[in-house]
Amino acid sequence: MKLVDEAEIEVFAGNGGNGCIGFRREKFIPLGGPDGGDGGAGGSVYIRADENLNTLVDFRHDRIFKAQRGENGMGRQAYGKGGEDLTITVPVGTVVINVATDEVIGDLTQHGDRLLVAKGGRGGLGNMHFKSSTNRSPRQALPGEPGEERTLKLELKLLADVGLLGFPNAGKSTLIRAVSAATPKVADYPFTTLYPNLGVVKVENYRSFVIADIPGLIEGAADGAGLGAQFLRHLQRTRLLLHLVDISPMEGGVEGISPVEQVRAIERELEKHDPELLRKPRWLVLNKADLMFEDEAKAAAEQIVAELGWKEPWFLVSALGREGTFPIMSRIMAFFDRQKEEEQEARNAQ
């Protein structure tokens, strides 16, 4: 499932250092010639693609990036030190657009791709360059040139890593709000989610993954009922499915359907639409535990798991109270890490 993530940033290359006005002054050479050195070049700003990143979420807060200014020239024909370049890392697949011209500067499609987005200013010339037959002691030097400044738009087509499955009102929108910065509409009636919502879940050390809240499925979704038909296809490219089920006993569960039947009904829809979806990793999330006493919720969860013969990981949570939600996210990150290691081992074995 691909949706667009975007961010706007400002980049400032470093100004060049100023040239120096200086004269040679040594013992026995009281009236030496000009020896002012040139200023150093300003640092440039680059954007580099990094396969370890997959969202632009960090640019929500860090929007201004400045490279280092070049140092001024000095006497004795000493050149100023050049400013350090600044490299901004973004996910592979990021498109960089110049906001002022709406021009695409570059498309970073491979890990390690590097793009110059703002060039540092050249250093100014020192007065040693202005000596002539008619001017033996020039008191003239040039200032450094300003570095380039640009406002850039970063666009990334996001591939959702995790898809949320479940009947209407199973709590998918509530869960995605609890674990990410997304704010989908949440209400206590079916089909609140009319379009896929996307959230970026940040785990430790600035790592993150993308989670998609697919509109609620009902029986017949594969045949066009409810809102599910047009969104079932979005699940095909996710790496993991979280199957949310309302275990609260109120009115016998969602729309009077028992939790076990909720699971089986959606499995039937997946089977009809694409049997491969049933072979995709799918974890069971038993939600709304806050509507029951703790021991009752645990007993109900264990009974549901037993009736289903569930072999994959399962979790008992309250998305509304954020109870038990973050351990799931950490477990997902670890699962993706293992996937990446296995893929790398497979490539190395070829």
From Swiss-Prot:
Its EC number is 3.6.5.-. Its cofactor is Mg(2+). It comes from Stenotrophomonas maltophilia (strain K279a). Mg(2+) binds at S173, T193. The keyword Hydrolase applies. Monomer. One of its GO terms (biological process) is ribosome biogenesis. The gene is obg. Residues 126-147 are annotated as: Disordered. This is GTPase Obg. Residues 160-337 form the OBG-type G domain.
